[in-house]
Structure formats: structure tokens, C-alpha cells
Amino acid sequence: MVKPTKVTNVIRVLRERAGMTQAELAGRIGVTRQTLIAIEQGRYSPTLELAFQLSRVFGLGIDDVFQYPEG
């Protein structure tokens, strides 16, 4: 069983607000829909490069899209 990552994100909320489907967003950042689903659900941590790409799609900084608990 895959252990969920500690990194959380608001990608699904941002994607839905932007009126994008999972397939559309996945295509814009060059990953499969399945990979995007895993990232949205916290089952997969994206690479730093992919995190930047996702953030830029929404015009936000990485820390606005991804959160890592302190401590």
C-alpha cells in the first residue's frame, strides 16, 4: 500500500474554479490524468519542476498551491 504524502495541495479546488477538467490540466503540464488524480489526492508528490508548472498554470506561487506541515 502506498503511504500518503505529507504534502497537501489545493489543486482540485483551483482546477474546478478555473473550469478545467483533470484531462485538460494534465495535458497542460504534460502528465497523465491518472498522475494528476494521484497528486490531487495526496498519493503522489510531484517533482519540484512539476510543482512549479502547476503553480504557474494558476498564476500562483508554489506555497499557495502546496502546503507542508511545520514541525
Indicate residue ranges for each PLM-predicted region.
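Alpha-helical residues within the helix-turn-helix
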Residues: 16, 27, 56
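A short, Lys/Arg-rich alpha-helix, primarily the initiator
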Residues: 1-17
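Short, charged recognition helix plus adjacent turn
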Residues: 1, 56, 66-71
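Short alpha-helical DNA-recognition segment
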Residues: 20-38
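DNA major-groove recognition helix of helix-turn-helix/homeodomain DNA-binding modules
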Residues: 49-64
